[in-house]
């Protein structure tokens, strides 16, 4: 399998033979990218990049198309960063592919790019195009490429996302973490049953002959080297850990990520860890919610009391913790409870494999054979039905029965949203309010129209229009949540509300949540405002008076 990389490769080792290395501008420190170029601003080649030529798989070898692939979110490269983040949040993904005016793949942007290239640089997401910060001409694979080779390349290169192309079109996005979780689960289960070791031994014996001495001792050595070492063996004194205070703004956290080239920061109070903030949190909880990184404090959007591991925790236990919790970053504490490091699943897995591959001679060759056997076993694992629709945080909520995960809140899409309504004088008000509290929303509305929120009789009914054109009353917190969820799913930046002050609407039962569709004339009357009610009532009164006068004159 060959891959494409027309821009400079990242310092993480992601490169191909066609890579052209270019030095960064002297005036600006390069920002490491996940896929392809360093700064994401390399020029596009004049001619179309060559399609990667896939190695023909032999019988029995799995291809990329048989891996757990996710449907790729593809947007035009002229989209703003804010809109891209909003769409990623709606899809609960942390990467999207970009296309040019010819609908061809031109780049990829990830949560790390948003944090380190936009927020850390002080750029405004609503005024910055993704084409300015994306990684151009990303490396990709064809759907018939060897799965094992693709996975090993991603682990060695330490990158997560890989576009999958079939017949010249992007069909999916490969997220290595999902495959790693499968591998971890499979290897742990197989190790307990002994089947993986037996299969590996069988493969070694076929290749090296049954006369190889002490295979059991070799296997034990392999297990000792790969699974049993403590995290302290892969964490050096120079390990980078980004620390911020709870009162620091998100912009400061993003700059720490950029400067240390990490994807997360630890929030510490004194010497104790009180939270963690990742680049995905910045995308989902800050940018997608249109919050100001300079004014939003870290403590408002961090994950409090994260699960931690000690330096004595084994590599296997650390992987198991992250696998069970479906999260990607794990803070490491020393014996005093202070933050020693923060590792991600790719770092740990890469370190574990490196321990095996750093062996010498025949031991190294057989170790590689063993690793391939383990990968093959992992690839044969059937994924859960709903795996591709879960994010790392939503999965934790689905596994709420695991007590140690109770400290992690649902990532969600934030607890606020933008609303808009027109008051009695025809003025339009736009504001941000909690997306789960109707009382809070009503209070803001009443304040904007200059009425007393404590006077229930003066409160209007709040109505919105759903995706089918029906007029729906918001009478409870759950109604509000449903309205906001619908707005987000349809890509709306703001939910337009309609206020109804009429007595007929106010007398409706609170259990009534939807008004049926009428004809076009009735549809207009369904949005009757207070002013419209006065006009209609006045017309009825005047008509009645006119009839009375006419009857009196006729009688006379």
Curated annotation (Swiss-Prot):
<keyword id="KW-0007">Acetylation</keyword>
<feature type="compositionally biased region" description="Polar residues">
    <location>
        <begin position="1"/>
        <end position="20"/>
    </location>
</feature>
<keyword id="KW-1133">Transmembrane helix</keyword>
<dbReference type="Pfam" id="PF00564">
    <property type="entry name" value="PB1"/>
</dbReference>
<dbReference type="InterPro" id="IPR053793">
    <property type="entry name" value="PB1-like"/>
</dbReference>
<keyword id="KW-0472">Membrane</keyword>
<feature type="region of interest" description="Disordered">
    <location>
        <begin position="1"/>
        <end position="63"/>
    </location>
</feature>
<keyword id="KW-0812">Transmembrane</keyword>
<keyword id="KW-0129">CBS domain</keyword>
<feature type="compositionally biased region" description="Polar residues">
    <location>
        <begin position="30"/>
        <end position="44"/>
    </location>
</feature>
<dbReference type="InterPro" id="IPR051462">
    <property type="entry name" value="CBS_domain-containing"/>
</dbReference>
<feature type="domain" description="CBS 3">
    <location>
        <begin position="235"/>
        <end position="294"/>
    </location>
</feature>
<keyword id="KW-0677">Repeat</keyword>
<feature type="domain" description="PB1">
    <location>
        <begin position="414"/>
        <end position="502"/>
    </location>
</feature>
<feature type="domain" description="CBS 1">
    <location>
        <begin position="68"/>
        <end position="127"/>
    </location>
</feature>
<feature type="domain" description="CBS 2">
    <location>
        <begin position="134"/>
        <end position="189"/>
    </location>
</feature>
<dbReference type="InterPro" id="IPR000644">
    <property type="entry name" value="CBS_dom"/>
</dbReference>
<dbReference type="Pfam" id="PF00571">
    <property type="entry name" value="CBS"/>
</dbReference>
<dbReference type="GO" id="GO:0016020">
    <property type="term" value="C:membrane"/>
</dbReference>
<feature type="modified residue" description="N-acetylserine">
    <location>
        <position position="2"/>
    </location>
</feature>
<protein>
    <recommendedName>
        <fullName>CBS domain-containing protein CBSCBSPB3</fullName>
    </recommendedName>
</protein>
<feature type="transmembrane region" description="Helical">
    <location>
        <begin position="527"/>
        <end position="549"/>
    </location>
</feature>
<feature type="domain" description="CBS 4">
    <location>
        <begin position="302"/>
        <end position="360"/>
    </location>
</feature>
<dbReference type="InterPro" id="IPR046342">
    <property type="entry name" value="CBS_dom_sf"/>
</dbReference>
<dbReference type="InterPro" id="IPR000270">
    <property type="entry name" value="PB1_dom"/>
</dbReference>
């Amino acid at each position: 399998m060959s891959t494409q990389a027309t821009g400079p490769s990242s310092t993480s080792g992601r490169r191909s033979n066609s890579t052209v290395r270019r030095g960064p501008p002297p005036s600006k420190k390069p920002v490491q990218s996940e896929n392809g170029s360093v700064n994401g601003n390399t020029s596009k080649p004049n001619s179309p990049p060559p399609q990667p030529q896939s190695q023909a798989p032999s019988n029995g070898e799995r291809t990329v198309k048989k891996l757990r692939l996710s449907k790729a979110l593809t947007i035009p490269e002229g989209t703003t960063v804010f809109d891209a983040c909003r769409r990623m949040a709606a899809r609960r993904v942390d990467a999207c592919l970009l296309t040019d005016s010819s609908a061809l793949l031109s780049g990829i942007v990830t949560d790390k790019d948003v944090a380190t290239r936009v927020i850390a640089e002080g750029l405004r997401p609503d005024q910055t195009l993704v084409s300015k910060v994306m990684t151009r001409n990303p490396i990709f694979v064809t759907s018939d490429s060897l799965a094992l080779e693709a996975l090993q390349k991603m682990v060695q290169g330490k990158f997560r996302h890989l576009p999958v192309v079939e017949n010249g079109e992007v069909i999916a996005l490969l997220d290595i973490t999902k495959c790693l979780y499968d591998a971890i689960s499979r290897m742990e289960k197989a190790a307990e049953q002994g089947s993986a070791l037996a299969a590996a031994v069988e493969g070694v014996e076929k290749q090296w002959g049954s006369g190889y001495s002490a295979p059991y001792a070799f296997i034990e050595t392999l297990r000792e080297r790969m699974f049993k070492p403590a995290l302290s063996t892969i964490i050096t004194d120079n390990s980078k850990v980004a620390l911020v205070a709870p009162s620091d703004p998100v912009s400061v956290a993003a700059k720490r990520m950029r400067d240390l080239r990490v994807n997360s920061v630890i929030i510490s109070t004194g010497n104790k860890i009180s939270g963690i903030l990742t680049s995905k949190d910045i995308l989902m909880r800050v940018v997608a919610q249109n919050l100001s990184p300079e004014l939003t404090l870290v403590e408002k959007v961090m994950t409090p009391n994260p699960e931690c591991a000690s330096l004595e925790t084994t590599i296997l236990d650390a992987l198991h913790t992250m696998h069970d919790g479906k999260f990607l970053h794990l803070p490491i504490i020393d014996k005093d409870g202070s933050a020693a490091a923060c590792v991600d699943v790719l770092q740990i897995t890469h370190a574990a494999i490196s321990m095996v591959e750093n062996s010498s001679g025949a031991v190294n060759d057989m170790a590689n054979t063993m690793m391939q056997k383990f990968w093959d076993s992992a690839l044969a694992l059937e994924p859960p039905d709903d795996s591709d629709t879960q994010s790392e945080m939503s999965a934790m909520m689905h596994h709420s029965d695991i007590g140690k995960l109770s400290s992690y809140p649902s990532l969600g899409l934030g607890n606020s949203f933008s609303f808009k309504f027109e008051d009695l004088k025809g003025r339009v008000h736009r504001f941000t309010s909690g997306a789960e509290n109707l009382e809070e929303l009503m209070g803001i509305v009443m304040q904007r129209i200059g009425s007393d929120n404590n006077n229930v009789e003066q409160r209007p009914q709040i109505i919105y229009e759903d995706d089918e054109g029906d007029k729906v009353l918001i009478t409870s917190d759950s109604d509000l949540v449903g309205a906001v969820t619908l707005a987000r799913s349809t890509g709306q930046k703001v939910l337009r509300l309609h206020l109804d002050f009429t007595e007929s609407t106010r007398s409706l039962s609170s259990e009534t949540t939807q008004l049926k569709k009428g004809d076009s004339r009735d549809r207009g009357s369904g949005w009757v405002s207070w002013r419209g009610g006065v006009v209609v009532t006045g017309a009825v009164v005047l008509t009645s008076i006119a009839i009375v006068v006419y009857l009196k004159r006729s009688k006379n």
